């Protein structure tokens, strides 16, 4: 997804006071703008392990998208952001997320659980589930929902689900960047990734 961390591979950013994050950008260079088969529009938690959602161009017959992603990329870290398309079945969402988290851990991958800015399910129960599971499994939590509360309109577009897409650079020397959903999503995700990198390398 070019709208998630992509500018950090494309060089279209100025870190300003966050220059301490540059070693993390360098460490994961090439990972931000590449094609990821594990990211799909409209993905539900229950379709992560459904081969019907896998990219036929990249994935083997019968292979689900997360298994395909792990085979192709051999990741050390996985951002888990689900819930916007999971409404009305919180117990199912919890069960499915547990499967994703356990799959990552079983494969030696650190899952970073990310909360979402929207309220598509009509409440905030999916974010509460995400927080609860991060605590239960003792894995990193990237609580973007808390940051979204500080943004105009939570940083969301008119559909109230997706963040507003802009083509502006991530210039963190410009105060306006701290009012934009994508710029703050990427900065906060990079901070979370930096914390994980430091913990792993200690």
Predicted regions and their residues:
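Short flexible/disordered coil segments
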Residues: 47-58, 98, 104, 141-144, ...
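Extracytoplasmic/secreted proteins, especially bacterial periplasmic and envelope-associated proteins
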Residues: 65, 74-77, 92-99, 103, ...
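Extracellular/periplasmic catalytic domains that process cell-envelope and extracellular macromolecules
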Residues: 70-74, 106, 135-136, 202
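Active-site segments of SGNH/GDSL-like serine hydrolases
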Residues: 79-85, 98, 102-130
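Catalytic His-Asp segment of secreted/periplasmic serine-dependent ester chemistry enzymes
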Residues: 118-202
